[in-house]
């Protein structure tokens, strides 16, 4: 199976410009290809990861990746299928975010070895000294307004209004393809399915200005079985930066993937062979309650993004938090992350309350009678250890990093005391 057929088998091809010619090129030659990343945040996210891993698959197949940071286009903002104008970022912010993109991409792509080592460039390099007159004469003249407004990404904004700044974005992206072709013989662009209009502007400019054929592959929008955009948890993006989304949070995200989506996501987000995934699917379907596919997803993706050690720590954290282990083995940050949905109650560090008083004060028990019953019946745990002394008073050893104590009532009801 060649790389193009594998991408299709994994559900990673939505549209292409000339499938036969592209498949032939990917089979016979080393193809230089690129993906553009506009620095619109200080971290890439799970949606970007699909494209990053597709870049890696192509590099592993012998093709040469170029990561294009949109230092110029990031100052403008892509209007594609957005309801309103993007907020314009300052040049300093875009420059700072561009540097973070590079450091994240280095985790996945090989920038050091071989003829097909990855390279990174910034479109600010060619837009910085391009005058407005030159842009209109040398680039703008190759696009008709009719062509530009026919793009679905622009049509969706015609009624609500679109500025000339964002209207011209597709030409800027098209010019990126032209410049990369002239500088590095790049002939293929990868992008999300919402980028089709902008990407084909590049193949059009390449055809008109250089009489060359460029190729485009769009990746489908990754959705779950209900049709919702995949990659968010409770409405929040899953970031690749560990400070924005911890490895534990990412681990839990994958563990909670719906059964109907798990095998599909294994094909998209892991480097397990299709044969291995088929075997996992067979075992998974035979015993869905064991959630094998989700466990493999969590292992593969967290290890890929954050490393094996971070994955193992996430597993340990999960086992201790939900398996009844000693929470003092964990740091306060991991506990707060893992129990972020649990009620919190702040008390003074020097407040000497008995356990009964503490249960009532924190709202864990509604009355002294109930508190006594819970303690006597062994339903109260401090940092994972059962406490049955009615007059127990918290000690310094109960205060993890002098920041918190976790009280659990029964099997699942956790409460976090903070100091």
UniProtKB/Swiss-Prot annotation:
Q: What is this protein called?
A: Tyrosine--tRNA ligase
Q: Which SMART domains match?
A: S4
Q: What is its EC number?
A: 6.1.1.1
Q: What is its main location?
A: cytoplasm
Summarize the subunit comment. Homodimer.
Q: Where does ATP bind?
A: 232
Catalytic activity reads:
tRNA(Tyr) + L-tyrosine + ATP = L-tyrosyl-tRNA(Tyr) + AMP + diphosphate + H(+)
What task does this protein carry out?
Catalyzes the attachment of tyrosine to tRNA(Tyr) in a two-step reaction: tyrosine is first activated by ATP to form Tyr-AMP and then transferred to the acceptor end of tRNA(Tyr).
* CDD domains reported in the protein's UniProt record: S4, TyrRS_core
Q: Please report, in chain numbering, the residue ranges of the motif 'KMSKS' region.
A: 229-233
A Gene Ontology biological process noted in the UniProt record is: tyrosyl-tRNA aminoacylation
In terms of Pfam families, this protein maps to: SYY_C-terminal, tRNA-synt_1b
Q: What superkingdom does the record give? A: Bacteria
Q: Keywords assigned by UniProt?
A: Aminoacyl-tRNA synthetase, ATP-binding, Cytoplasm, Ligase, Nucleotide-binding, Protein biosynthesis, RNA-binding
Report the Gene3D superfamilies cross-referenced here: HUPs, RNA-binding S4 domain, Tyrosyl-Transfer RNA Synthetase
Naturally occurring in which organism (per UniProt) = Lactococcus lactis subsp. cremoris (strain SK11)
* Any Gene Ontology CC annotation: cytosol
Q: Which InterPro entries match?
A: aa-tRNA-synth_I_CS, aa-tRNA-synth_Ic, Rossmann-like_a/b/a_fold, S4_RNA-bd, S4_RNA-bd_sf, SYY-like_C, Tyr-tRNA-ligase, Tyr-tRNA-ligase_bac-type
Q: Map motif 'HIGH' region onto the chain.
A: 39-48
Q: Where, in this chain's numbering, is L-tyrosine bound?
A: 34, 169, 173
Question: What subcellular locations does the record give?
Answer: Cytoplasm
Q: Where is the S4 RNA-binding domain?
A: 353-419
Q: What molecular function terms (GO) are annotated for this protein?
A: ATP binding; RNA binding; tyrosine-tRNA ligase activity
Family according to the record: Belongs to the class-I aminoacyl-tRNA synthetase family. TyrS type 1 subfamily.
